[in-house]
From Swiss-Prot:
This is Photosystem I assembly protein Ycf3. The keyword Repeat applies. The gene is ycf3. InterPro entries: PSI_Ycf3_assembly, TPR-like_helical_dom_sf, TPR_rpt, Ycf3/AcsC/BcsC/TPR_MFPF. Keywords: Membrane, Photosynthesis, Repeat, Thylakoid, TPR repeat. GO terms for cellular component: plasma membrane-derived thylakoid membrane. It comes from Synechococcus elongatus (strain ATCC 33912 / PCC 7942 / FACHB-805) (Anacystis nidulans R2). Essential for the assembly of the photosystem I (PSI) complex. May act as a chaperone-like factor to guide the assembly of the PSI subunits. It is a peripheral membrane protein. It holds the Pfam family TPR_12. Its main location: membrane.
Length: 173
C-alpha cells in the first residue's frame, strides 16, 4: 500500500493532500513528479521512524531526479537517516555528496560538524587525544563554513568555537 494511503494523523494527511495537489499542477515532466512522490513518501516514512522504507524511497527519488539542487536535498535526507542510525561514515559521505551539488547548504555543514564533534568526544573518552583534536578541528572547520552561510544560526557552535579558541574573529561576516 502506498505510504500516502497509510497516514493516520491530520497533519500527515494535510501534507499529503497538498503535495498531491502541487504535483498535479506543477509544470514539470512525469519523471520529476514521480521523483517528488518518492521523496515525499521518504520524508513521511522517515518521520514515522521507518528508516529502511525511507531509504528505499529516497534511493528511487535519487534515481529519477535530475535537478542537482533537488538531488542535494535527497542526499541530505539520506544522510539524516544514516545519522539517526549511527552510521556516521555513510552519513558523512552523503552530506558531502549533497554539498558537492549544493555548496550553499549550511544545515549539511552543521551536521558534518556535529558528527565530527561527537566522534571527537568519543575519541577523547577512549583516551585518544590526537584523534579527538583532529575531529574537533574538523568540526570547527565545518561549523565555520556553516556560520559564514548563516551567521544568525548555530549560536551554540559559535560559542563552542569561541570557548575552545577555534573561532576566527572575522569568520562570521
Amino acid at each position: 500500500m502506498p505510504r500516502t494511503q497509510r497516514n493516520d494523523n491530520f497533519i500527515d494527511k494535510s501534507f499529503t493532500v497538498m503535495a498531491d495537489l502541487i504535483l498535479k499542477v506543477l509544470p514539470t515532466n512525469k519523471k520529476s513528479k514521480e521523483a517528488f512522490a518518492y521523496y515525499r513518501d521518504g520524508m513521511s516514512a522517515q518521520a514515522d521512524g521507518e528508516y529502511a522504507e525511507a531509504l528505499e524511497n529516497y534511493q528511487e527519488a535519487l534515481t529519477l531526479e535530475e535537478d542537482p539542487i533537488d538531488r542535494s536535498f535527497i542526499l541530505y535526507n539520506i544522510a539524516l537517516v544514516h545519522t539517526s542510525n549511527g552510521d556516521h561514515q555513510t552519513a558523512l559521505d552523503h552530506y558531502l555528496q549533497a554539498l558537492d551539488l549544493n555548496p550553499k547548504m549550511p544545515q549539511a555543514l552543521n551536521n558534518i560538524a556535529v558528527i565530527h564533534h561527537f566522534l571527537g568526544q568519543r575519541s577523547e573518552e577512549a583516551g585518544n587525544d590526537d584523534e579527538a583534536e583532529r575531529h574537533y578541528d574538523q568540526a570547527a572547520e565545518y561549523w565555520t563554513q556553516a556560520i559564514r552561510l548563516a551567521p544568525n544560526n548555530y549560536i551554540e557552535a559559535q560559542n563552542w568555537l569561541k570557548t575552545t579558541g577555534r573561532s576566527k574573529v572575522d569568520v562570521y561576516f
